[in-house]
A protein has these predicted regions:
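N-terminal pro-sequences and low-complexity stem/linker regions of secreted or lumenal proteins
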Residues: 1-353
Length: 353
């Protein structure tokens, strides 16, 4: 997931980011009308892995504290979607479903790779480099980047679910540092966690589902960057640098060549435009913070051996569509607001023969 760029400044103006908007688009499928679901960052990340709509806390990135939902809050059926969490909070009750919980229950593997997690274990809340998060109902010290550490909690949606963090050992084995391209992990690692480069070496070690969060410099969020060792010329240049390093490693891996799919998108753009019949959740009348309920048009590119290179898809999608598409591909039931979308990545995107 990348940060804070609307379609017009990226895919709509390839001179700004030629590797993403020209090279990768020519190799895959451009989703021209792909939208965020709110502002600021966190609610978009949460939506993509759980289908939960924005609430006032997640809309504000939970910067005031890593607060749990009140014990009195309940899940409800909301405008056609079941399992939507009521109330305001940051850390969702254990009963709230997630994509990775579904995957694990059906025998699939998953991993979330967080760049810079564990660089400063005390700050990140990751004593052994992995599963970094604040104490529940405590302050979040990892809101902004510091020298040498650009991990921020709000770009790691997995730690906002009790179903993940309450099993510390399981969380530490699944929510891990990205590592370097040579496979080196932070010095704080004491559990033998493996990063993306090492996991990509074989089909057997590559998770069925992976989620990658660059640090807040390389995802384009910050410019200039407190954690940046070699300054780039712009936020988009920093994004390009990250993609040029990691996309070839992913697409040349045995698992990707066999049957992989890589999605590259942004959390939110400018404005509050939306698609796909998105409606506000039960506790937030304006998740877009403006005249509409969404997070603006951001676009996305999909890469896969099963995609016709240079495909341009004009149908509308959003982060709930991504979740619904992944659930459909794995034969899983749809969670929360993923139940409300009609458009998914289907035969209109993939070639089947």
């Amino acid at each position: 997931m990348l940060e804070n760029e609307g379609y017009g400044s990226t895919f709509g103006d390839p001179a700004n980011d030629p590797y993403l908007a020209r090279t990768l688009v020519r190799r895959g499928a451009l989703l021209e009308n792909y939208y965020g679901v709110g502002h600021n960052s966190l609610d978009n990340y949460i939506a993509m892995i759980s289908g939960q709509p924005p609430n006032p806390s997640t809309q504000g990135d939970c910067t005031s504290g890593f607060d749990a939902f009140p014990s009195s809050s309940r899940s409800t059926t909301w405008r056609g979607a079941t399992g939507v969490q009521q109330g305001t909070g940051c850390v969702y009750p254990a009963r709230v479903g997630t994509l990775v919980g579904q995957l694990a229950a059906h025998g699939f593997t998953w991993k979330a790779y967080m760049q810079d997690m564990g660089n400063d274990p005390h700050r990140d809340g990751a004593p052994d480099s992995a599963c970094g998060h604040p104490s529940v109902n405590g302050p979040d010290p990892a809101i902004n980047a510091v020298a040498g550490d650009g991990y921020v909690t709000r770009h790691d949606p997995f730690v906002y679910f009790h179903s993940i963090i309450d099993n510390a050992a399981n969380c530490r084995s699944h929510v891990v540092p990205l590592g370097t391209t040579s496979g080196t992990m932070p010095k704080s690692d004491t559990i033998g966690a493996t990063g993306l480069a090492q996991d990509l070496r074989s089909v057997a070690t590559t998770p069925n589902f992976s989620f990658i969060s660059p640090n807040v410099c390389q995802d384009g969020h910050d410019y200039p960057c407190a954690n940046q060792r070699t300054p780039g010329s712009s936020a988009l240049a920093d994004i390009e640098g990250f993609l040029k390093v990691w996309v070839p490693r992913i697409t040349s891996s045995p698992a990707f060549k066999a049957d992989g799919l890589l999605e590259i998108t942004f959390d939110e753009g400018s404005g509050s435009t939306s698609c796909c019949g998105e409606v506000p959740g039960p506790t937030n009348s304006a998740p877009g913070g403006g005249g509409g309920p969404g997070g603006g048009r951001v676009g996305a590119v999909l890469l896969s051996p099963f995609i016709r290179p240079g495909e341009v898809v004009t149908r509308a999608f959003n982060h709930y569509s991504t979740l619904a598409s992944i659930e459909d591909l794995f034969g899983l039931p749809r969670l929360a607001d993923a139940q409300t979308v009609r458009g998914t990545f289907d035969r209109g995107v993939f070639r089947t023969g």
